[in-house]
């Protein structure tokens, strides 16, 4: 079975011609490039046998440098040396300044509220910085492979939302890359481990990098990779370990950095200390006029809450997947931060088994991406690997009464397309507003708005006669497109969802938790809203009928009786007693039964007026 080859980009009709393709692990701290060469998947190394390329760009007066050269400028020129741009991508300036107040950069806001970093070469967006990194990786890969790349697979955290994924694709396009696919980092690791070890069963992929954390629960069976559930934190990683350790060192030295250069030097020292403590139980540290010893135990205490935070996310992912901890067959460790002994110990205790670390955790994602790229570019058309990712949050549409109708439920396998049919609410309605929502709650006010568009040109008919088919489609990169079409005329409108910025980790967590804690209240609110909608429809229908035929077929007393029932139902509708509203609808229906019969008789009389008996028969 081919890997979702229905219409994968990058594939051609000439499968026997070997094409150059690479997998790019675009990391927060470091990036890597890997490729399949002579049947072997390898990470590309530079002239000094180094695999890791720092995800750093330095914008100098005369030139721009990327990678190791740029990283060397971090302490010398911190305001023009952009590190961890991946943390900023797809976020608003307000979010960035709140979340990362200690960054040494000078920010200004773009027209749509996104952050721009002021550098010697002008204002740079996180997308442009990422594009510069990708351009560097592209040149490096083409130099190593000796030819032009036909396509790339770029990995992203599984919990990246639409804005962050789209921003990553925009960066790749700016860099001139042909993106075959965006691939979730944990899924890429599963590909690498699944092909190497042939494991089957449920596995957990614990991915703790420099700036992001992801957990994925996957089922591996007969070459099929199915993601059962994902969870993550887009603002948790090894960088946070560094900041905690840096603060501790500053406190011990009784000295706070006085400028951006000293702050960068302190962070560099903290990173070096963290790495040393992964090998030794204690290490010497010198900062300002202070010299002392930091033990692994002290470091463990500093990062304990952050590690526990990651394990809470793991617990939610297990619940979402519907599996117990003991069902996990293997735990795959991904990301350089999983080298920290305390992280490995805590993860091992949580899952009750020793984590897998046989593949270099820094390289495993790039290796999996390279395998995927080799298939998508057409070099392995007979591959039997099937990869199934999932939608992390439900996608829905607003309906009458401020309700949310879920079109694609959370954890549906992607790519996926789902459609539902809706109708008009008013007589003569010629347009319909489509409000696209994301979240797990029942009411619009409790979900996240992704976008709106209007379908115009609906033929004017009585309410409920027109049929509008709304289709939601999530592609392999997790990007959403929504189309609304009126079935009789085929008139349609659509939207490609590209939010201006992404969800914070707190918002993602809250959206999931609140759907559980408020489930009962949400359902009661939904039932009340649905009853109010039914009341509105009944009232509108009766008022329209009265305007058309009431004066002709009803006595004054009958007319007033129906008006009184309408007024009563309008009053009941303002309250919160669902049963009372339902009874009001029944009372109005009962009060209009005679009116309905008289309207039917009147309609028959008008239809037969002036016609001979033989014409009717």
From Swiss-Prot:
The keyword Hydrolase does not apply. It comes from the Bacteria. InterPro entries: ATPase_NBD (IPR043129), Heat_shock_70_CS (IPR018181), HscA_NBD (IPR042039), HSP70_C_sf (IPR029048), HSP70_peptide-bd_sf (IPR029047), Hsp_70_fam (IPR013126), ISC_FeS_clus_asmbl_HscA (IPR010236). One of its GO terms (biological process) is iron-sulfur cluster assembly. GO terms for molecular function: ATP binding; ATP hydrolysis activity; ATP-dependent protein folding chaperone; unfolded protein binding. The keyword Manganese does not apply. PROSITE patterns: HSP70_1, HSP70_2, HSP70_3. Keywords: ATP-binding, Chaperone, Nucleotide-binding. Chaperone involved in the maturation of iron-sulfur cluster-containing proteins. Has a low intrinsic ATPase activity which is markedly stimulated by HscB. Belongs to the heat shock protein 70 family. PANTHER family: HEAT SHOCK PROTEIN 70KDA. NCBIfam families: HscA, PRK05183.1. This is Chaperone protein HscA homolog. It comes from Actinobacillus pleuropneumoniae serotype 5b (strain L20).
């Amino acid at each position: 079975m081919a890997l979702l080859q229905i219409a994968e980009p990058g594939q051609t009709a000439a499968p026997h011609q070997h094409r150059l393709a690479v997998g790019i692990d675009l990391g927060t701290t470091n990036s890597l490039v890997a490729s399949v060469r002579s049947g072997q998947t390898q990470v590309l190394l530079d002239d000094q046998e180094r695999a890791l390329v720092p995800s750093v760009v330095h914008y100098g007066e005369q030139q721009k440098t990327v990678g190791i050269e740029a990283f060397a400028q971090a302490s010398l020129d911190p305001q023009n040396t952009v590190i961890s741009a991946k943390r900023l991508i797809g976020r608003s300036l307000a979010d960035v300044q709140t979340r990362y107040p200690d960054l040494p950069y000078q920010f200004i806001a773009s027209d749509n509220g996104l952050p721009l970093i002021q550098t010697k070469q002008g204002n740079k967006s996180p997308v442009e910085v990422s594009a510069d990194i990708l351009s560097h990786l592209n040149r490096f890969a083409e130099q190593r492979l000796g030819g032009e790349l036909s396509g790339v697979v770029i990995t992203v955290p599984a919990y990246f939302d639409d804005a962050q994924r789209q921003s990553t694709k925009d960066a790749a396009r700016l860099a001139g890359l042909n993106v075959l696919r965006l691939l979730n980092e944990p899924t890429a690791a599963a590909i690498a481990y699944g092909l190497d070890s042939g494991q089957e069963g449920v596995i957990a992929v614990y991915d703790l990098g420099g700036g992001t954390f992801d957990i994925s629960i996957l089922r591996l069976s007969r070459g099929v990779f199915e993601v059962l559930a994902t969870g993550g934190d887009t603002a948790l990683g090894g960088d946070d370990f560094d900041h905690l350790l840096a603060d501790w060192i500053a406190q011990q030295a009784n000295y706070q950095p006085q400028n951006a250069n000293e702050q960068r030097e302190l962070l560099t020292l903290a990173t070096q200390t963290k790495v040393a403590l992964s090998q030794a139980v204690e290490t010497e540290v010198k900062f300002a006029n202070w010299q002392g010893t930091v033990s692994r135990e002290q470091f463990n205490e500093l990062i304990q809450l952050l590690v526990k935070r990651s394990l809470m996310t793991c617990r939610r992912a297990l619940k979402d997947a519907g599996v117990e901890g003991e069902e996990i067959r293997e735990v795959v460790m991904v990301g350089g931060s999983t080298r920290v002994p305390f992280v490995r110990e805590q993860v091992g205790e949580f899952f009750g088994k020793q984590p897998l670390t046989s593949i270099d955790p820094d390289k495993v994602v790039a290796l999996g991406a390279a395998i995927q790229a080799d298939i998508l570019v057409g070099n392995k058309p007979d591959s039997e690997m099937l990869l199934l990712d999932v939608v992390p949050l439900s996608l829905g549409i607003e309906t009458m009464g401020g309700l949310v109708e879920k079109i694609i439920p959370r954890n549906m396998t992607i790519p996926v397309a789902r459609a539902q049919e809706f109708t008009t609410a008013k007589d003569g309605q010629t347009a319909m507003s489509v409000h696209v929502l994301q979240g797990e709650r029942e009411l619009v006010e409790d979900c996240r708005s992704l976008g709106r568009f209007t379908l115009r040109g609906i033929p004017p008919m009585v309410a409920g006669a027109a049929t509008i088919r709304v289709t939601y489609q999530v592609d392999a990169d997790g990007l959403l497109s929504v189309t609304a079409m009126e079935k009789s005329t085929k008139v349609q409108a659509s939207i490609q969802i590209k939010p201006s910025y992404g969800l914070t980790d707190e918002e993602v967590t809250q959206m999931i938790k609140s759907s559980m804690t408020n489930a009962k209240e949400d359902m009661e609110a939904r039932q009340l809203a649905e009853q109010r909608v039914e009341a509105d429809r009944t009232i509108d229908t009766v008022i329209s009928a009265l305007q058309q035929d009431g004066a002709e077929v009803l006595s004054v007393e009958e007319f007033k009786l129906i008006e009184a029932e309408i007024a009563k139902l309008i009053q009941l509708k303002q309250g919160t007693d669902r049963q009372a509203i339902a009874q009001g609808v029944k009372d109005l229906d009962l009060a209009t039964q005679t009116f309905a019969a008289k309207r039917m008789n009147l309609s028959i009389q008008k239809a037969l007026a002036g016609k001979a008996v033989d014409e009717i028969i």
